[in-house]
Amino acid sequence: MTAASRANPYSIVSSEEDGLHLVTMSGANGFGNGKVHTRRRCRNRFVKKNGQCNIEFANMDEKSQRYLADMFTTCVDIRWRYMLLIFSLAFLASWLLFGIIFWVIAVAHGDLEPAEGRGRTPCVLQVHGFMAAFLFSIETQTTIGYGLRCVTEECPVAVFMVVAQSIVGCIIDSFMIGAIMAKMARPKKRAQTLLFSHNAVVALRDGKLCLMWRVGNLRKSHIVEAHVRAQLIKPRVTEEGEYIPLDQIDIDVGFDKGLDRIFLVSPITILHEIDEASPLFGISRQDLETDDFEIVVILEGMVEATAMTTQARSSYLANEILWGHRFEPVLFEEKNQYKIDYSHFHKTYEVPSTPRCSAKDLVENKFLLPSANSFCYENELAFLSRDEEDEVATDRDGRSPQPEHDFDRLQASSAALERPYRRESEI
């Protein structure tokens, strides 16, 4: 038996690609993770950037019957054009059905005969053919009431059909109005104004490597009880040899400490601490360039106007995670309020001091981390903003500005810190 014939038919790689699997070995510097890195196999997204799930259902038994059994949900989920077409056809069908019934009643009662040979009152006045019966059906169901045609007491069947058509018309109207209102008020449309950053970043936060991404709300109306979740999705082979194409692993974003619940008034950076329980614990910057996984991020909450739960989704592939970057500030204090500049929402800047090793190596080998007092890009913006406010205040008072005391003090403090890398603002 050849190697090709022994290949697993359910494997995600071919027999030619089987040799590209990662093998373990010790690193040359003793701090490696024991992997030889090969090219990354391109994978399809499970969740698209706009939140849609990249799936297609196939070979579903009795799909039409199951969808028709839940007609209301089907009408809400389908496109507007199809929903309006369905209701238009429903109205036409009911008008035609009752028009035919009124026409049959008129024929059976002899109302279509000439007036000279007819010696009794017709069931429906002014109905002399099918077109007149159809118009009477429309007038009855829509309560137009032109006054030319009306049912008489001559035929109880005609009276009963008028009552039945009125009930059917109310049912169709109620169903249509309910479906349209439910479709217009769907909370998933609220997700269009909830924003995720284009990239996620990995950087140090309080001395620990953290995975971070940013979320924002483009409306002034709040998302009540907003909370976030995240999952890492990647293929996995169990110890028994079972292949799981999309294994879902929860990523902790502070559930135990309540950090997953956010007050989403301004853009917030969501934080996942890469610790021993994290699926990213053994991933370094080099691994990130070759690994194959997807991180699905979910934001849930209630719409303030309707109290209905909405959910916004996005995802980050491994090549969309920037190692050693931080997000640029978007919140600035301006006069008596705070200003949010969304032009910086997706922008990041590089932090050269970020370790390139994994969090596991960082813990085990205890790499030296930069001082907590190191000069930071956000700190520089804060100092510059304060200097501008001081200049404006002194110009307004008509006094000459003081010497650049704060800036000199800043230069003196920053010069005392010997850094082997460039300042973040110079990147």
Swiss-Prot record:
K(+) 1 binds at residue 143. It is found in: Membrane; Cell membrane; Cell membrane, Sarcolemma, T-tubule. Activated by phosphatidylinositol 4,5-biphosphate (PtdIns(4,5)P2). PtdIns(4,5)P2 binding to the cytoplasmic side of the channel triggers a conformation change leading to channel opening. Inhibited by Ba(2+). A motif (PDZ-binding) lies at residues 425-427. It is a multi-pass membrane protein. One of its GO terms (cellular component) is T-tubule. Highest level in cerebellum. Inward rectifying potassium channel that probably participates in controlling the resting membrane potential in electrically excitable cells. It probably participates in establishing action potential waveform and excitability of neuronal and muscle tissues. Inward rectifier potassium channels are characterized by a greater tendency to allow potassium to flow into the cell rather than out of it. Their voltage dependence is regulated by the concentration of extracellular potassium; as external potassium is raised, the voltage range of the channel opening shifts to more positive voltages. It catalyses: K(+)(in) = K(+)(out). It comes from Mus musculus. A 1,2-diacyl-sn-glycero-3-phospho-(1D-myo-inositol-4,5-bisphosphate) binds at residues 79, 81, 183, 188. GO terms for biological process: potassium ion transport; protein homotetramerization. K(+) 3 binds at residues 144-145. A motif (Selectivity filter) lies at residues 143-148. Gene3D superfamilies: 1.10.287.70, G protein-activated inward rectifier potassium channel 1. Belongs to the inward rectifier-type potassium channel (TC 1.A.2.1) family. KCNJ12 subfamily. K(+) 4 binds at residues 145-146. The lineage of its organism: Eukaryota, Metazoa, Chordata, Craniata, Vertebrata. Residues 105-129, 147-155 are extracellular. Keywords: Cell membrane, Disulfide bond, Ion channel, Ion transport, Membrane, Metal-binding, Potassium, Potassium transport, S-nitrosylation, Transmembrane, Transmembrane helix, Transport, Voltage-gated channel. The modification S-nitrosocysteine is found at residue 75. Its main location: membrane. Disulfide bonds join 123-155. Residues 130-146 dip into the membrane without crossing it. The gene is Kcnj12. This is ATP-sensitive inward rectifier potassium channel 12. InterPro entries: Ig_E-set, IRK_C, K_chnl_inward-rec_Kir, K_chnl_inward-rec_Kir2.2, K_chnl_inward-rec_Kir_cyto, K_chnl_inward-rec_Kir_N, Kir_TM.
